[in-house]
Amino acid sequence: MYSSYSPLQRRQLREQTYTDTQSTYLLVYAPGRRNALTLSLAEQLHRKFRLVDRLEGELTPSVNGVLLVSEDVECTSTALTYFAAALQQGADLVVCDAVFGYDGGSALYQTDQHLPGQRCALLSRALLDRCRATARGKDDVLELLRLANQLAQNCRCVPQALLHFRRELCAEDVFSAKGRRALILSHELTMTGAPIVLVSAVPVLRSLGFEVVVLGPADEGPLQLFLDAGAAVVTRPDCVTSSALWGLATSADLVLANTVVEAPVVNTLNGSFVPVLWWLHDAFAGYPFITHKIPRELGKNVHICAVGSHATAAMHSVRPDFEIEQLIYGLPDYAAEQFPRYDISFAGGRTLFVTVGSLEPRKGPDIFCNAIRLLPSAVREKAAFLFVGKAADKGMYNAVDSLVRDYPQTVFYRKRLERPEVKSLMEQCNCVVCASRDDPMPTFVTEGLIFGKPSIVSEHTGTAGLVTEGVDGFLYKDDDPQQLADKLAWAIEHPEMLAAMHDDCRRLYEQQFSNESYVATLTRLVKELTDGE
C-alpha cells in the first residue's frame, strides 16, 4: 500500500506516531462501491473495526463510533488510528485532510471552522443516533454527513491526509450545497507579502457569509495562517496553468484573484457570470512576461483593485484604460499581540537596521550593501545591519555574503524567520530599510510602522508616496547608494530623533494600513460585485 501513497502522505507518514486505540470499537459503513477501501482496510494498524454495508442490526452496544464512507476511497494504514484517537479525546465528528487525483497531486487541507462537503467522516455513536433520528432517508450516507455537520458539538479536523480519492477534486468536496462560495486564487503560498496580506481577506469574506476556499501551489509557509483564519486550502503545483481545478471558480459566487499572475484564470472568467475581484500587488518587472495573458477589455463581472499607486501604474503601463480602485491591505495590530522575544544580542545594543525580502535584483540588496560600504568606518561601527530573505539570485546573495564576511561584527544574514520572530524583530529594531528598485507596497515596512519604526525607502516603492520626509520615514532617489548611505548615517548619528518618530509612524499605520479601513473598503467592493449595491 505504501507505494500507492501520494508524496504528501509519505512525507506525513514518516512523522506520525503510534497511539494505542484498540479499545475503541468502530464500524466502517460503506454501502456503495468499496474495492479500494476494502484493500486499504486490511492494512490498518487499528484492528478493532468491522466493515458493513448497512447499519440496521449492526449497531451493537459496544460500537463507539461509525466511519461513514460515501464513495470508494483509499486510506492510509494509520487512518482508523487517528479517527479513533480523536474519538477518545472527546470529538463527536472527526474529519481529515485528503489528496485527490490518480497521483494524489491535489491536496485538501481542512479546518474545524470550515467543514462542508464531507464525503467521509467519523461520527460518535451519540451523534450518529441523533442524525439517524432526524434523517428522512434510510441511512443515506450523504444525508447523515450533512446532518452531522449541523448537529456536531465538538468537531475535530485531523491535520493529516489520511484519504486518497483517485478522482479529481470538485466543488462539492469543499463547498456546501446551499452556502455562499468564495474562491481565493494565489499563485504562491510563501511567506512573502502578497500571500501574507491575502490572509486578512478570509475573515472579511466569512463575515459576509461566504465559505472560503484558497487555491494555490504547494505550501511554503502561510497555509496554516489561512486555516487559522477559517478557510479550507487546496494545493496543486500547476494550479495557475492547469484548468483541472478551474471548475471550482465557475461554481463560486465570488473569485478573488491575487496578483497579476492569475491573469490566465481572469481571462477565462472574463465576461462570465462569476464575479471576479482582481487584486494587484505587482511591480513593473513582472509585466513583460504576462502581458499577453491579460485581457484587453474587461467584462462587467471583473473589477480591479491595487495596493497603491505603484501597483496601479504597473498595470496602466500595459492596459492604460483599465479602471483600478485602491485597496491597500490592512494588517492586524501586532503590537497588541504576545509573541516570543527574538534574540538580537548580535546587535550589541547598537542601532539596528533591518531589511526583509528575497535576495533578487528587484529588491535591491546590492544597493543596500553598497550604501553600507560607503559609510565611514566610525559611523558604520555604531550600527548593526540584518538581511532576512532567501537567496533567489546568486549575484545578490554573493553581494550580501561578501559584506557579511568583510564586516562580521556589523552585518548579519538570516535565510528565513518565522512569523513570530519577524514580529519580535520589528518590535526591537530601530529602523527598516527597503532598497527595492520596484516594489508596490513592501509588507515588512508596514509591519515596522505597526511598532512605530521609521523606514528608509526607495522612491520606487508604493510606500514612498505615503511617507513624510523626516516625520515618519525617509526617501532616497535614483537607486543611489550614496543617498541611502547619507540617510543611514543621519539615523545612526541621531538615535534619539529616530526613536522620537514612533508616534508619527504609528499614526501612518492607523491612517493607511489599519484593518478597519481595509475591511470597510473590501466589504464595499465585494458587495458591489455580488449584491449590486
Residues of each region from the PLM?
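Conserved donor NDP-sugar-binding/catalytic core segment of glycosyltransferases
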Residues: 78-106
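A conserved mid-protein helix/loop that constitutes part of the nucleotide-sugar donor-binding site
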Residues: 195-203, 360-374
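Glycosyltransferase donor-sugar binding loop
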Residues: 214-220, 384-398
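Nucleotide-activated donor-binding/catalytic signature segment of Leloir-type glycosyltransferases, i.e.
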Residues: 232, 398-417
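Aromatic "clamp/platform" in nucleotide-sugar-dependent glycosyltransferases that forms part
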Residues: 437
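Short hydrophobic beta-strand element within catalytic cores of glycosyltransferases
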Residues: 454-457
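Conserved acidic donor-binding segment of nucleotide-sugar-dependent glycosyltransferases
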Residues: 469-470, 474-481, 490-495
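A short, well-ordered alpha-helix in the C-terminal region of glycosyltransferases
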Residues: 483, 490, 497-512, 518-524
